């Protein structure tokens, strides 16, 4: 199936998890369950935030958008993984590949900005509580979210445009389970210098800006917490930031491990699985299980839905 001539490649083969044919069925079932839980968890969180007026605050606006982007990330990758478990040739066209990368890049870039925005929101809430409503209003959080999507979309389009300038005439086998930028560089017959330059010009500043925002915000938060005389106040502040800090830590550790320089091969696949599939699965539970406001909102929505369901059943009788 692999191309050995120098004709231009318009289709690729996603090698993915084909090295383990004996695990095909268990892996298919595992990824199916992960995909289902991820979509239900994230879209359910978006629905709860939308339906509960008390959650229409900056923190939950950012959280809802984060859940939406995690759903986008999962939709961009997992369906193709599931299809390829039982596909004979595991092919993906060039334009399918570009579309998959576009949505992945959009989701991951937006995640970086949203996590930074959530860190800044927590900084304002803990370090400047009296000025919170003036420094972080609902209107500002909506504007920041819109700006995040516009910037992420432009960032993604820039890299897709640069990828389309490349010609692929080497092997058409992508040693990965999705179309990512670095594995595609390896297959290019065109010098990817401009593409790499775009990474340094656009992607690196985004990473530096968002990581710096998170680090500075949490440094100020920790200083404020340690200055608090009340144990209850410190406990409440730690509890407020713990879930976000845990999520941010996992996301950036995995992302930095993944984008490090690496050799030919598929050594980066386990890390890629974690940050593209596992993190979107975990996020709604990290932010919800220990959050009383979200838990109470879920109970309220379920109770309301149950009331409507019972009323409909009574009317049907």
Curated annotation (Swiss-Prot):
Q: Which ranges make up the Cytoplasmic topological domains here?
A: 50-56, 115-144, 220-239, 290-317
Gene3D superfamilies according to UniProt: Rhodopsin 7-helix transmembrane proteins
InterPro entries tied to this protein? GPCR_Rhodpsn, GPCR_Rhodpsn_7TM, Olfact_rcpt
In Gene Ontology terms, what is a biological process of this protein? G protein-coupled receptor signaling pathway
Q: Could you tell me which cysteines form disulfide bridges? A: 97-189
Provide GO CC annotations from the record.
membrane; plasma membrane
Extracellular topological segments: 1-28, 78-93, 166-198, 260-268
**Family assignment from sequence similarity:** Belongs to the G-protein coupled receptor 1 family.
Q: What does this protein do?
A: Potential odorant receptor.
Q: Which PANTHER family match?
A: OLFACTORY RECEPTOR (PTHR48018)
What protein name is recorded for this chain? Olfactory receptor 5K16
Organism listed in the record: Mus musculus (Mouse)
Q: What is its main location?
A: membrane
Q: Which residues cross the membrane?
A: 29-49, 57-77, 94-114, 145-165, 199-219, 240-259, 269-289
Q: Where in the cell is it found?
A: Cell membrane
């Amino acid at each position: 199936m692999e191309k050995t001539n120098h004709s231009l490649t318009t289709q690729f083969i996603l090698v993915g998890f084909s090295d383990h044919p004996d695990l095909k069925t268990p892996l298919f079932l595992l990824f199916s369950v992960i995909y289902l839980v991820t979509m239900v968890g994230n879209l359910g969180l978006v629905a709860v935030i939308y339906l509960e007026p008390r959650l229409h605050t900056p923190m939950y606006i950012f959280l809802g958008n984060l859940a939406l982007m995690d759903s986008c990330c999962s939709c961009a990758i997992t369906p193709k993984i599931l299809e390829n478990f039982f596909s004979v040739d595991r092919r993906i066209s060039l334009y399918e590949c570009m579309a998959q990368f576009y949505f992945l890049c959009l989701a991951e870039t937006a995640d970086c900005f949203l996590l930074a925005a959530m860190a800044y929101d927590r900084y304002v809430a803990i370090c400047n509580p009296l000025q919170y409503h003036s420094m972080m209003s609902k209107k500002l959080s909506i504007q920041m979210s819109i700006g995040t999507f516009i910037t992420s979309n432009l960032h993604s389009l820039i890299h897709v445009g640069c990828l389309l300038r490349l010609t692929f005439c080497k092997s058409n086998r992508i040693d990965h389970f999705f179309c990512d930028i670095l594995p595609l560089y390896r297959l290019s017959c065109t010098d990817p210098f401009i593409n790499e330059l775009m990474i340094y010009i656009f992607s690196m500043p985004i990473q530096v800006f968002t990581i710096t925002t998170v680090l500075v915000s949490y440094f100020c938060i920790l200083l404020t917490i340690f200055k608090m005389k009340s144990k209850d106040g410190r406990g409440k502040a730690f509890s407020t930031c713990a879930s976000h800090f845990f999520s941010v830590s996992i996301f950036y550790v995995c992302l930095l491990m993944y984008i490090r320089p690496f050799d030919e091969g598929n050594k980066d696949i386990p890390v890629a699985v974690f940050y593209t599939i596992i993190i979107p699965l975990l996020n709604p539970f990290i932010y919800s299980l220990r959050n009383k406001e979200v838990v109470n909102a879920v109970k309220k929505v379920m109770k309301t839905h149950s009331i409507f369901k019972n009323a409909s059943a009574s009317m049907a009788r």
